[in-house]
Each structure stands twice: as structure tokens, then as C-alpha cells.
UniProtKB/Swiss-Prot annotation:
Gene Ontology CC: cytoplasm
Effect of substituting C9A: No change in activity
InterPro entries cross-referenced by the UniProt entry: Aldolase_TIM, His_biosynth, HisF, IGPS_HisA/HisF, RibuloseP-bd_barrel
Subcellular localization, as worded in the UniProt entry: Cytoplasm
Name used for this protein in its record: Imidazole glycerol phosphate synthase subunit HisF
Lineage: Bacteria, Thermotogati, Thermotogota, Thermotogae, Thermotogales
Key words of the record: Amino-acid biosynthesis, Cytoplasm, Histidine biosynthesis, Lyase
Catalyzed reaction equations: 5-[(5-phospho-1-deoxy-D-ribulos-1-ylimino)methylamino]-1-(5-phospho-beta-D-ribosyl)imidazole-4-carboxamide + L-glutamine = D-erythro-1-(imidazol-4-yl)glycerol 3-phosphate + 5-amino-1-(5-phospho-beta-D-ribosyl)imidazole-4-carboxamide + L-glutamate + H(+)
Consequence recorded when altering D130 to A/C/F/G/H/I/K/L/M/N/P/Q/R/S/T/V/W/Y: Complete loss of activity
Reported function: IGPS catalyzes the conversion of PRFAR and glutamine to IGP, AICAR and glutamate. The HisF subunit catalyzes the cyclization activity that produces IGP and AICAR from PRFAR using the ammonia provided by the HisH subunit.
């Protein structure tokens, strides 16, 4: 059985990590390379860099950053945010990103999923889906959760797999930032619809929440602030999960 993965998410703006971190032993906690290296050393299985820089002219900064990260880090890393076309996705992968995460662009141009998958393999394409409840149905939202697409979550999950996605990054807008636990109802809803790995996102606040996500059917759990502010220690989290019967990677811890 494949080990369940713990993923840290870093928001990057103009080549710097924002939203703050609380690591005293880092010279510069705003440096994505240093922070990424640190995370890889303490047992995080994968990293997601989310480029929240709005402007296209800053893309060069992200490309240079990806190159530096690829040189320094030996765990898989995904880059997302602002990827609207094949050229951008392609450049990021060629510079060293293991995977790219696409969200709004995938909804607006689903053939982009297929194009990236056919060129670089399905494992390089993560489709990020932001969903929330509307009148009792899970609906897909784009533009950072602002626009209701009118697409049912169940339909979109099936389509992204057909189109060649390798993974689904499932964020519950209702839970994001609440620290009240992952949306296990949403995870359970999506699980039977796809054979793709599901990364649960939104709501991590304590170790039990990770266990709940895995028991609900998630293959990986992503979190940000609980790691950045050391509210959860990665080693302790993995030991806790193992004790509760979850297969996690402990080598190097």
C-alpha cells in the first residue's frame, strides 16, 4: 500500500514566501529555497509552491525560483497559481518542477489538462478543485473561490480523470483557514468517483484532522499555517498517524 503523504503549502509572492513562518533557526524564513530545504529535512513528503503574484511580468522570478528549488530539494514539488497556458506549465516543468497545479485554467480550457499530460505524463498534472456547498450540492468554484462555475463537483472530478489528470487537489472553501478539520464529507463524496489520488486541503488544525482525512479516503493531506507556525510538529504527526494504523514514510526522520 502506498504511504500517505503530508504536504506543506507555501504561498509565494514575487519570489518570497508570504503569510509568515515561525522558524527561528532559519536565517530568512521568507526564502522559499531555504524553507523548502528545511521542510524536506524535517520529514515533509512534498511541497506545493503557490504563486500568488498576480502580474504576468513576474513569471521570470518564479521560473528562476523553481530552478533554485529543484537544485536544493530532494522531495517532489508542485507549482501552482497563475498557470493559464501550456507554455507556462511547460517552462515550469522544464525548469525543474515535478508537477504543475492548474485550477481556473483547467475549467476554462479542459484540453490543457490533456496537453500537459500527453507531453509530460499524467503524474505531472495536478488539477486543483475548489468546491463548496450550494443548496445542498457540491459546486466547483474558480478565481480563488469567487466564481461559482455552475459545474457539479461530481461531474468535474470524472472529467478531469478522463482528460488525463494525475491527481486531484481538493480544497473545501467552507473549511479553508478555519482549522476546524478537513471536509471529510466532501472527501467521502469524491472518493468513489475517481481512481486518482486525492490531496485533501482546507481546515487542518490538529493531528486528529489528518487522521480523519486519511480515514475518509484521502491519499495526501496538505496544510500551511499549522506547519509554518509550528503548531504541529511533522515528526510527531507522522508518529501519531503510524500509531493509528496509517502507513506513512518515516525514513530520515
Amino acid at each position: 500500500m502506498l504511504a500517505k503523504r503530508i504536504i506543506a503549502c507555501l504561498d509565494v509572492k514575487d519570489g518570497r514566501v508570504v503569510k509568515g513562518t515561525n522558524f527561528e533557526n532559519l536565517r530568512d524564513s521568507g526564502d522559499p529555497v531555504e524553507l523548502g530545504k528545511f521542510y524536506s529535512e524535517i520529514g515533509i513528503d512534498e511541497l506545493v509552491f503557490l504563486d500568488i503574484t498576480a502580474s504576468v511580468e513576474k513569471r521570470k522570478t518564479m521560473l528562476e525560483l523553481v530552478e533554485k528549488v529543484a537544485e536544493q530539494i530532494d522531495i517532489p514539488f508542485t507549482v501552482g497559481g497563475g498557470i493559464h497556458d501550456f507554455e507556462t506549465a511547460s517552462e515550469l516543468i522544464l525548469r525543474g518542477a515535478d508537477k504543475v497545479s492548474i485550477n481556473t485554467a483547467a475549467v476554462e480550457n479542459p484540453s490543457l489538462i490533456t496537453q500537459i499530460a500527453q507531453t509530460f505524463g499524467s503524474q505531472a498534472v495536478v488539477v486543483a478543485i475548489d468546491a463548496k456547498r450550494v443548496d445542498g450540492e457540491f459546486m466547483v468554484f474558480t478565481y480563488s473561490g469567487k466564481k461559482n462555475t455552475g459545474i457539479l463537483l461530481r461531474d468535474w472530478v470524472v472529467e478531469v480523470e478522463k482528460r488525463g489528470a494525475g491527481e486531484i487537489l481538493l480544497t473545501s472553501i467552507d473549511r479553508d483557514g478555519t482549522k476546524s478539520g478537513y471536509d471529510t464529507e466532501m472527501i467521502r463524496f469524491v472518493r468513489p468517483l475517481t481512481t486518482l489520488p486525492i490531496i485533501a486541503s482546507g481546515g487542518a488544525g490538529k493531528m486528529e484532522h489528518f487522521l480523519e482525512a486519511f480515514l475518509a479516503g484521502a491519499d495526501a493531506a496538505l496544510a500551511a499555517s499549522v506547519f509554518h507556525f509550528r503548531e504541529i510538529d511533522v515528526r510527531e504527526l507522522k508518529e501519531y498517524l503510524k500509531k493509528h494504523g496509517v502507513n506513512v514514510r518515516l525514513e530520515g526522520l
